[in-house]
Design a protein with these regions (language model features):
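Helix-boundary and loop/linker segments of multi-pass membrane transporters
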Residues: 25-26, 67-73, 107, 165-169, ...
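Specific transmembrane alpha-helix
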Residues: 124-127, 135-158, 195-208
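Alpha-helical transmembrane segments of multi-pass membrane proteins
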Residues: 36, 40-47, 122, 176-184, ...
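Membrane-water interface of alpha-helical transmembrane segments
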Residues: 23-37, 112, 167-170, 229-233
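Alpha-helical transmembrane bundle and helix-membrane interface signal
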Residues: 107-111, 154-170, 209-222
Length: 257
């Protein structure tokens, strides 16, 4: 007589894997980046046009960094050089850097903070050039180096969020800055302006740049910026105070400048 087959209990159904997290980040379009590029191109066309038809580069005469004229009170020359360029190659290189670096930074910094950063980088760079270089100068590279400094601090302060990607990005930015400083050793390039822009970007972003955190209930998560307008104004105020003090010392003949 056949024995009944032993019944094998069914294995329990494995639990469903947890849903993948849905992470949203409030990114903006790089409107300011493209606006700055358009303004710079228009100004360069005016430079070329006045040079061609009048024999003088009127925008450069009115706005480039000239130490003696700044000492005489033309303080706008600590900002306006960022919209002026000396050649097609000069503006082409700077606008390419602005698009590559600026468009990504603006997405996370927001329009207002990015614009503030750009102007502060230019201000810091032109002040350092005013202090340490007797040569006239112009170009957006002061502001571009401000963006590089900001990018360094951004990835460093948010390294836990971005993980290994932050380390790679930080290494890339430092490498790009180092290469450009080496290029800046060539005659006719204002490395002091580059250094000042970098320092301004570092200071502003350390105190006022985005410091990101993840909030929400899993799996719906949001990337939020812990810093607000007060932090941005603090960072900007420190940059202005530091560089304006140095410029004032130079103008009044104080200190080692």
């Amino acid at each position: 007589m056949n024995e009944p087959l032993e019944t094998i209990p069914a294995l329990p159904t494995p639990p469903a894997p947890p849903p993948a997290p849905v992470i949203t980040e409030n990114l903006v379009s790089p409107v300011v980046t493209y606006t700055l590029m358009v303004i710079s191109i228009i100004v360069y066309i005016l430079q070329a046009g006045t040079q061609q038809f009048l024999g003088y580069d009127i925008p450069a005469l009115l706005g480039m960094k000239v130490n003696d004229l700044i000492i005489q009170g033309q303080l706008w020359r600590l900002l306006t050089p960022m919209f002026l360029h000396g050649s097609i190659l000069h503006i082409g290189f700077n606008m390419y850097a602005l698009i590559i670096i600026g468009s990504e930074l603006e997405r996370r910094f927001g329009h207002w903070r990015f614009l503030l950063l750009y102007f502060l980088g230019s201000f810091g760079g032109n002040v350092f050039s005013f202090l340490l270089s007797p040569n006239a100068s112009l170009g957006a590279s002061t502001a571009i180096f401000g963006l590089l400094g900001a990018e360094m601090v951004f990835f460093y302060q948010n390294r836990k969020l971005f993980g290994a990607g932050a380390r790679r990005a930080l290494q890339n930015v430092i490498t790009v800055a180092a290469i450009n400083f080496l290029i800046g050793l060539s005659p006719g390039i204002d490395n002091w302006g580059h250094l000042g822009g970098l320092v301004a970007g570092l200071i502003f972003t350390w105190f006022g740049g985005p410091k990101l955190n993840v909030e929400g209930l899993y799996p719906l998560l949001n990337v939020v910026d812990e810093r607000g307008l007060t932090d941005q104004l603090l960072g900007a105020g420190l940059v202005v105070l530091f560089f304006a003090t140095l410029a004032a010392m130079k103008i009044m003949g104080l200190g080692p400048f």
